[in-house]
């Protein structure tokens, strides 16, 4: 299956900002067998979620990239806060500092994400999220996710400009796409990330909650890491038998 190229990711991103989805729809139509992958550590809760047909939607405030889905870069807040303190000394009080620091996470606390990858052979992802091949990787059909109302969106990597000091009524909708579907850090580029996205209100949780398990279609396959324990292998065999999917060992 061909990966979603950098150029296509940019085209999809720009179209979504223009309230279109032609490029994304075409990509799905041209790649009906597209598979996306979720890397898991191998903890008991991961196996239980697999067996129950669920994935974890995590709060963006707890992502590895501290600026992921953040509305305001730290330096913008610092300049604004310093200016306010120079004009009014009371803003130096702890209670104001706490409020200022929390505002930068406004969207992060409201946005919930499940990150997926384009391949089950990404060494960086096996290392980061699956315990250096001691965990496992779950394969999902993108088409099944779409039909279940969980549309995956590809992340676009480029320059980000999402400062509160430039936010107004006209720019806000476009900036939301920058916040949700764009990353700037080059170190994340090789992950080929796609995202399932939802808001706290749709999930029935409180902003800032760490996350929630949501229903997804039955996976198509599970890859068990080559360094997985005998206990995990047995657990995956049991779970996969319950949902009738194959397990590939020594991934």
Q: Can you say where each PLM-predicted feature lies in the sequence?
A:
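Partner-binding and oligomerization surfaces adjacent to conserved cores of proteins
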Residues: 1-251
């Amino acid at each position: 299956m061909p990966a979603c190229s950098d150029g296509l990711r940019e085209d999809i991103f720009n179209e979504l900002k223009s309230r279109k989805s032609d490029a994304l729809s075409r990509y799905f139509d041209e790649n009906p067998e597209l598979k996306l992958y979720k890397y898991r550590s191998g903890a008991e809760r991961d196996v239980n979620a697999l067996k129950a047909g669920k994935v974890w939607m995590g709060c963006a405030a707890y992502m590895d990239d501290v600026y992921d889905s953040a509305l305001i870069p730290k330096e913008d807040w610092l300049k604004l806060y310093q200016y306010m303190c120079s004009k009014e000394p009371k803003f130096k009080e702890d209670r104001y500092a706490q409020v200022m620091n929390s505002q930068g996470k406004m969207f992060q606390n409201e946005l919930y994400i499940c990150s997926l990858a384009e391949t089950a052979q990404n060494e960086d992802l096996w290392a980061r999220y699956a315990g250096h091949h001691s965990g496992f990787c779950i394969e999902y059909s993108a088409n099944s996710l779409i039909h279940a109302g969980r549309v995956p969106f590809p992340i676009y990597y480029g320059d980000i400009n999402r400062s509160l000091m430039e936010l107004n009524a006209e720019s806000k909708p476009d900036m939301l796409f920058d916040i949700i579907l764009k990353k700037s850090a080059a170190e994340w580029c090789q992950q080929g990330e796609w995202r399932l996205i939802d808001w706290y209100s749709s999930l029935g949780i409180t902003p800032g909650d760490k996350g929630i398990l949501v229903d997804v279609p039955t996976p198509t396959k599970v890859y068990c890491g080559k360094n997985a324990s005998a206990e995990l292998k047995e657990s995956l065999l049991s779970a996969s038998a319950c949902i009738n999917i194959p397990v590939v060992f020594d991934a």
